[in-house]
Structure formats: structure tokens, C-alpha cells
């Protein structure tokens, strides 16, 4: 997942980096040539408004996504002081498996089964490294320490079972948020934002070309005047085409239904988690 995110971010930055220097060089060249003799052309208000909305939306997602991506970090709310227990568990499994090599085939059979079961349990525990799972494992250890005869042992046992259910539900919620929100933003919206940056630069370039064409008309000799005017009309058409193309892309990015559904998915998955967790916890009998 981290590799994928790095790849997407790298593509976006590379696209921006390749466009920005060209736009700056073009602007510098034109301003040097024109000076203050030609007033900068104004772009249509509806285009400018859409462009600003896209920039604002990108900034909004850049604020929210890194925080929501926390759900993709293994054990993000897992107590640090409990990780040693999990590490020790892993060492125990590895030790038992390594010791199999010193036994005869007949002796290996039952222990191999134990080692395999322990490895399977360890693998199964990895996706559910949440605070709830840590509470569950701690309560389970407490039950063992107290012994079956202690009247409070069953209470710790119930806590262990219920907290494990909630922890597993949280793991499901986090996976759903990652799939329905984080991956969608990275795979769909970020490439569109990169494309929006490219077409924005293209519009600016076409505008500068039109300004240059108009400057050529002012300084054209009579025999070249019609040619220069034709170049202005061509530049106007290219600018209008670039603006219309950009507006279509901007409107796709700003689609209210798509973005609302995307954001709603965070709340929907949280709501489902809390409802399912409440139902699971209501089974308590202590």
C-alpha cells in the first residue's frame, strides 16, 4: 500500500514539475517581449470560478486523506506496551518450529501440528491489531492467571470474547474505509487533479499565445496584416477550445454526487461499525 501511494504521489509531482517550468518560461518570454503594451487577457469568469473550486477541492482532500489513511497503518491504536507480548508469541512459535529439526519424523508429527496451528493463529491475529484486540488478549491472560475457580474469571473471559469481536469489526471498518475512500481518492481523484493542473497550464499557454498574436497585429506590416489577424483568430479558437476542455474536466472533478458519496462512505462505514459493535457488546451478562 505504501509503495502504491508513493507511486501515485510521485506521478502527480512529476506531472506538476514538468509543466510549471514551461509555463514560467513562456510567461517570462512574453512579458519581456510585450512589456506593458498589451493588457493581460481576462479569462471567462465561469472558467476562473471552476478552476478555483478545483484548487480548493484538491486542498481539502490533501487535508483529509492523510488523516483518514491512518486506518491503513497496521496497529495504529494498538498499545505500544502490549506489543512485546505479541513479539514474544511470535518468538515462541518460531522457536517451536526450529526445534522440530532436532526431532525424529515420529516425534515431529504432533509438534509440527502444534507449530502449524500456532503459526495460523499468529497470522490470523495480524489483521486485528486494534486497542480492542489488545484488551481482549490482556483479559484472556488475566482469566488464565486467575484460574477457573475464581468467580471473576468468567467476567474477564466475557470481556475477552466481546472485545475481540469489536476489534475484528474495527478491522473490517478500516478495510472498508481504505477501499471505499482512500483508494478511490488516490486512484481516481488524484490523477484527475494532475490532469487539471496540466490543462490549467495549457489554458495559460494558449492565452499567452493569443496575447503574442495580438501584439504581432499591432506591429505588422500592411502585407502581413491579414496573416497576423488570421493568427489571432486561430489563437482565439485554440484558447476557447482549451477553456472548454478544461471546464469539462473541472466539472467532472467537482461532481457533487460523486464527492458526496465518497465522503459519505467514511460515515457509513463508521456507523455500521458502531451499530455492529453495540449489538455485540449487548451480549454481556456479567
UniProtKB/Swiss-Prot annotation:
GO terms for biological process: endocytosis; meiotic cell cycle. It comes from the Eukaryota. The keyword Lipid metabolism does not apply. GO terms for cellular component: cytoplasm; Golgi membrane. Coiled coil: none annotated. InterPro entries: AH/BAR_dom_sf, BAR_dom-cont. Has a role in meiosis. This is Meiotically up-regulated gene 64 protein. The gene is mug64.
Amino acid at each position: 500500500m505504501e509503495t502504491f501511494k508513493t507511486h501515485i504521489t510521485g506521478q502527480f509531482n512529476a506531472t506538476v514539475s514538468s509543466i510549471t517550468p514551461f509555463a514560467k518560461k513562456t510567461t517570462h518570454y512574453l512579458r519581456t517581449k510585450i512589456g506593458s503594451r498589451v493588457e493581460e487577457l481576462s479569462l471567462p469568469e465561469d472558467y476562473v470560478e471552476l478552476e478555483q473550486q478545483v484548487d480548493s477541492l484538491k486542498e481539502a482532500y490533501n487535508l483529509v486523506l492523510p488523516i483518514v489513511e491512518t486506518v491503513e497503518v497496521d496497529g495504529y491504536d494498538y498499545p505500544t506496551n502490549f506489543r512485546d507480548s505479541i513479539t514474544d508469541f511470535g518468538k515462541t512459535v518460531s522457536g517451536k518450529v526450529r526445534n522440530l529439526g532436532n526431532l525424529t519424523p515420529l516425534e515431529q508429527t504432533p509438534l509440527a501440528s502444534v507449530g502449524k496451528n500456532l503459526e495460523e493463529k499468529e497470522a490470523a491475529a495480524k489483521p486485528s491489531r486494534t486497542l480492542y484486540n489488545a484488551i481482549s488478549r490482556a483479559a484472556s491472560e488475566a482469566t488464565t492467571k486467575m484460574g477457573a475457580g475464581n468467580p471473576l474469571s468468567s467476567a474477564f473471559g466475557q470481556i475477552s470474547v466481546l472485545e475481540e469481536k469489536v476489534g475484528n469489526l474495527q478491522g473490517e471498518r478500516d478495510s472498508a474505509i481504505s477501499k471505499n475512500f482512500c483508494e478511490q481518492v488516490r486512484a481516481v481523484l488524484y490523477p484527475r487533479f494532475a490532469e487539471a493542473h496540466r490543462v490549467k497550464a495549457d489554458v495559460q499557454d494558449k492565452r499567452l499565445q493569443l496575447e503574442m498574436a495580438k501584439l504581432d497585429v499591432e506591429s505588422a506590416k500592411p502585407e502581413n496584416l491579414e496573416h497576423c489577424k488570421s493568427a489571432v483568430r486561430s489563437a482565439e479558437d485554440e484558447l476557447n477550445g482549451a477553456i472548454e476542455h478544461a471546464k469539462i474536466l473541472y466539472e467532472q472533478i467537482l461532481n457533487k454526487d460523486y464527492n458526496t458519496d465518497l465522503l459519505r462512505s467514511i460515515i457509513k462505514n463508521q456507523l455500521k461499525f458502531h451499530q455492529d459493535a453495540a449489538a455485540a457488546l449487548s451480549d454481556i451478562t456479567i
